[in-house]
């Protein structure tokens, strides 16, 4: 099988650094190749790894002395390690396998067969990439693997190759090419494309698989790129510019395939909003912008515009950066007798008659039909107007500013979303059966197409969708929003047609068949349930697995009201709070079939959280039930809003009917902010749980309660509501700071002498890491299921950082200390200033923090007067009547009123 000049068919070079958790699996995937391990040389290059990788390497090298070479070198980075490994390579073909990835068993056999068949045509073969661990699915560049074939990059330049690990390279092709050790990001794409540039072709082997591990600890290079300073100017210089310079020496023009590849990397940099999203200083950021402009100058306009996986708004902004003052000569708008057009270099790219309006909200009020949405287009939005037409009546749309939807690139607002609102009096519906929407510019007016988002109740992705409101049923037909009277006959016909369409689509798609079968069953059960249940249903939920927050406190209050409303609390059945709440109220297991049916039948969903899992227990099956999500969402909040969360909590993303606030400045910041709610949607009522806060009595206690940090925890499992353990958490400053605090002997000794207990209770999103902390005998670690209320009521002093629990604690005028050793947190504050508005000292130093705690212990845990005054000025109510205010406000929603 082997040629005379080579001892192996393949040499696999594996650069190793800090991968002991994954290394064995990677090595075994090579050993188990169907081609036979005797035909493979495995070169393990230890780049001075500090973990136990060396032990694993030596064990395998000893077990397979004829196949495995182990080499150790001084740390120099992945390119250095790969180049070092090439010195030992004795195979015909080279693969650079990352030690946390895998290859499918038949990969080498399939690749060898392909090389044997096409050995003189190509120097490199690529295989498709599939994600593993932290992400599922396949790489978005896999679309070129329609078949096993040779790809000619001059004929298909848009099919780019950016990953060297999923390629196999002829050793002879690497004689004069090495990885650029000065290039820290993009070094593999650089090498691969320099090789491709020789023959302008490469092979594709569809049958093989490269399993790319996206680590759950967030440490894959792809995941951490933007946090790395090298991702900015360094990569533009050593990767993009240098690659262009090398090719310029050999070719008159940069080949299209290389332009596409460079633009593929550059497009992610266009998503940077401004300097605040970078680790750069002002001079470095200025250079960053200059480098982007310089690289774009080598990329054809068509290549820029045809770049995939990024909005056209960013791509046209790239054209604007490239052409500067001359941009208007390349991209411009013109009106003709037929239409209004957008041109790029003389070619029509958009026209007024081809525009689409998106309807996001469709509501039926007492006297009108209320419609809200937006228009997204490459046209400059200035001068465009919208109106609805019903019969012969035209109703102008009101413009709505939607700053949270603005597209921002590199410090410039590149696209504003024109939002609109239309109220159609019900009197116009009597003699008509459809509504049309028009867009105008100058003298031109054109009928628009329609697209629907979730709060409309309709969908463009399913046939025969409809939504039944109080008096009317709405559906659509291409460019018309249709309606008819809501009666049993019309509802039955629309539902029958929708279910029939669903059933047909399920028969055509095996992938969707199971989901559609469940949807059909759930919809039928829902319709039967509504026949027998005429009472309104309210659902209350805190977290999936924990109660004891605002929703439970309000639930406990509301169930004692004789108002004809059925009230249920939603929580996981294995939660410790499930049986406790069941003793006094009705409890439904989270995501149980009954929970799902009740969601479809509910009039109110009331929660301390606004995440998708609160309002949608169906998760990705939501599309089949969109028309039945008719409940009003009441957001009680978990903590007081200090930052601008309008990008997340805005009306079009969450559609909150009543958002409860507790503080005067908080209320003002939301009413006047970019949330797009009306004043009556925001209630200044106080948190329900505040009604049960008490002054501490009996034992004295110091409560240490820091919040979480998104950069030190792993992504949350939305279904389970938990985060997996992060082995790198102990490397964080957060860990070292709080571990030192809860083991500080000076603090502990003084607490002992003065009879103060010390309790440590970090945020629930840190609880999976609690095992990492060193536990002092005197310090109690509060259980995850501990009652917040009991902890607040039994404590005298609190240490926190940025957490909103400080508000609960200070509400009873107990002393709070803010331990803020960082310069910034993971959100930007809106109106709130800790030093000017906080209820205690803001400290950065460990010793100063301990001094302040001791001061309070010496002074009977009394909050200073200046902070007591701040409490009085901040909170709207301290009368223990918050639950009543909120309960009455929810009742009055049905009358479109909010209790003042």
Swiss-Prot record:
SUPFAM superfamilies: Nucleotide-diphospho-sugar transferases (SSF53448), UDP-Glycosyltransferase/glycogen phosphorylase (SSF53756). Involved in the biosynthesis of galactosamine-containing minor teichoic acid, a non-essential cell wall polymer in B.subtilis 168. GO terms for biological process: cell wall organization; teichoic acid biosynthetic process. GO terms for cellular component: membrane. PANTHER family: GLYCOSYLTRANSFERASE, UDP-GLCNAC:BETAGAL BETA-1,3-N-ACETYLGLUCOSAMINYLTRANSFERASE-LIKE PROTEIN 1. GO terms for molecular function: CDP-glycerol glycerophosphotransferase activity; glycosyltransferase activity; hexosyltransferase activity. Keywords: Cell wall biogenesis/degradation, Glycosyltransferase, Teichoic acid biosynthesis, Transferase. It holds the Pfam family Glyphos_transf. It comes from the Bacteria. This is Minor teichoic acid biosynthesis protein GgaB. The keyword Repeat does not apply. Belongs to the glycosyltransferase 2 family. InterPro entries: Glycerophosphate_synth, Glyco_trans_2-like, Nucleotide-diphossugar_trans, TagF_C. Pathway: Cell wall biogenesis; poly(glucopyranosyl N-acetylgalactosamine 1-phosphate) teichoic acid biosynthesis.
């Amino acid at each position: 099988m082997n040629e005379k000049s080579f001892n192996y068919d393949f040499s696999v070079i594996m650069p190793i650094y800090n991968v002991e958790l994954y290394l064995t699996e990677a090595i075994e995937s090579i050993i188990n190749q169907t081609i036979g391990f005797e035909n493979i040389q495995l070169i393990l290059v230890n780049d001075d790894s500090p973990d136990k990788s060396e032990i694993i390497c030596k064990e395998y090298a000893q077990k397979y002395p004829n196949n495995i070479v182990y080499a150790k070198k001084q740390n120099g980075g992945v390119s250095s390690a790969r180049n070092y490994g090439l010195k030992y390579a004795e195979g015909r073909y080279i693969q650079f396998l990352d030690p946390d990835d895998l290859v499918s068993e038949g990969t080498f056999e399939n690749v060898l067969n392909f090389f044997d068949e096409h050995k003189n045509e190509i120097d490199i073969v690529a295989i498709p990439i599939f994600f593993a661990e932290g992400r599922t699915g396949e790489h978005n560049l896999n679309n070129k693997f329609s078949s096993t074939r040779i790809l000619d990059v001059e004929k298909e330049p848009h099919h780019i190759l950016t990953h060297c690990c999923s390629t196999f390279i002829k050793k002879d092709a690497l004689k004069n090419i090495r990885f650029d050790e000065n290039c820290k990001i993009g070094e593999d794409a650089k090498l691969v494309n320099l090789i491709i540039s020789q023959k302008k072709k490469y092979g594709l082997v569809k049958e093989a698989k490269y399993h790319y591990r996206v680590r759950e600890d967030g440490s894959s290079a792809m995941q951490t790129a933007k946090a790395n300073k090298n991702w900015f100017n360094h990569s533009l210089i050593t990767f993009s510019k240098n690659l262009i310079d090398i090719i310029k020496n050999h070719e008159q023009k940069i080949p299209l395939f290389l332009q596409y590849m460079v633009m593929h990397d550059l497009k992610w940099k266009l998503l940077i909003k401004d300097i605040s999203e970078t680790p750069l200083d002002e001079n470095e950021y200025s250079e960053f912008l200059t480098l982007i402009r310089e690289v774009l100058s080598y990329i054809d306009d068509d290549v820029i515009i045809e770049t995939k996986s990024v909005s056209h708004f960013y791509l046209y902004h790239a054209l604007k950066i490239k052409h500067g003052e001359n941009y208007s000569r390349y991209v411009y708008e013109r009106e003709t007798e037929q239409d209004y057009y957008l041109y790029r270099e003389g070619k029509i790219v958009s026209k007024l008659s081809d525009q689409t309006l998106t309807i996001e909200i469709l509501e039926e009020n007492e006297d009108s039909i209320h419609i809200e949405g937006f228009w997204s287009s490459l046209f400059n939005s200035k001068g465009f107007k919208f109106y609805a037409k019903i019969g012969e009546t035209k109703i102008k749309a009101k413009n709505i500013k939607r700053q949270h939807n603005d597209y921002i690139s590199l410090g410039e607002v590149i696209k504003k979303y024109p939002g609109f609102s239309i109220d159609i009096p019900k009197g116009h519906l009597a003699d008509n059966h459809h509504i049309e929407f028009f867009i105008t510019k100058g003298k031109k007016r054109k009928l628009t197409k329609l697209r629907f988002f979730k709060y409309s109740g309709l969908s463009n992705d399913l046939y025969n969708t409809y939504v039944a409101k109080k008096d009317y049923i709405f559906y659509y037909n291409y460019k018309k929003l249709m309606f008819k009277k809501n009666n049993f006959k019309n509802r039955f016909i629309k539902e029958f047609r929708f279910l029939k369409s669903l059933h047909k689509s399920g028969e055509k798609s095996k992938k969707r068949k199971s989901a559609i079968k469940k949807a059909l069953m759930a919809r039928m059960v829902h319709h039967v349930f509504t026949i027998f249940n005429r009472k309104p249903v309210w659902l209350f939920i805190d977290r999936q697995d924990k109660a004891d927050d605002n929703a439970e406190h309000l639930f406990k209050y509301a169930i004692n009201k004789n108002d004809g409303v059925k009230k249920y609390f939603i929580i996981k059945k294995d939660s410790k709070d499930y049986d406790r709440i069941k003793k006094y109220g009705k409890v439904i297991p989270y995501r149980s079939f009954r929970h799902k049916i009740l969601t479809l039948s509910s009039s109110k969903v009331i929660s301390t959280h606004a995440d998708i899992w609160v309002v949608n227990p169906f998760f990705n099956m939501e599309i089949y039930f969109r028309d039945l999500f008719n409940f009003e969402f009441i957001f009680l909040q978990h903590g007081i809003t200090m930052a601008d969360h309008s990008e997340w909590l805005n009306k079009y993303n969450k559609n909150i009917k009543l958002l409860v606030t507790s503080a005067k400045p908080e209320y003002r910041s939301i009413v006047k902010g970019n949330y797009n709610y009306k004043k009556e949607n925001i209630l200044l009522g106080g948190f329900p749980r505040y009604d049960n806060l008490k002054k501490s009595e009996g034992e004295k206690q110091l409560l240490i309660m820091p919040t979480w940090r998104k950069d030190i925890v792993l992504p949350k499992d939305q279904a389970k509501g938990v985060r997996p353990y992060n082995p790198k958490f102990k490397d964080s400053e957060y860990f070292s700071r709080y571990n030192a605090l809860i083991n500080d002997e000076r603090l502990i000794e003084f607490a002992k002498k003065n009879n103060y207990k010390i309790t440590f209770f970090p945020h629930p999103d840190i609880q999976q890491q609690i095992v990492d902390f060193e536990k002092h005998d005197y310090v109690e670690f509060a259980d995850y299921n501990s009652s917040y209320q009991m902890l607040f009521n039994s404590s005298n002093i609190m240490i926190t950082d940025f957490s909103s629990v400080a508000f609960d604690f200070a509400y009873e005028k107990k002393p709070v200390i803010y331990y803020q050793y960082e310069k910034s947190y993971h959100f930007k504050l809106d109106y709130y200033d800790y030093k000017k508005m906080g209820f205690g000292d803001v400290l950065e130093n460990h010793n100063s923090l301990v001094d302040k705690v001791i001061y309070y212990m010496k002074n009977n845990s009394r909050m200073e007067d200046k902070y007591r005054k701040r409490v009085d000025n901040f909170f709207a109510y301290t009368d223990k009547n918050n639950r009543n205010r909120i309960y009455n406000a929810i009742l009055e929603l049905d009358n479109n009123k909010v209790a003042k």
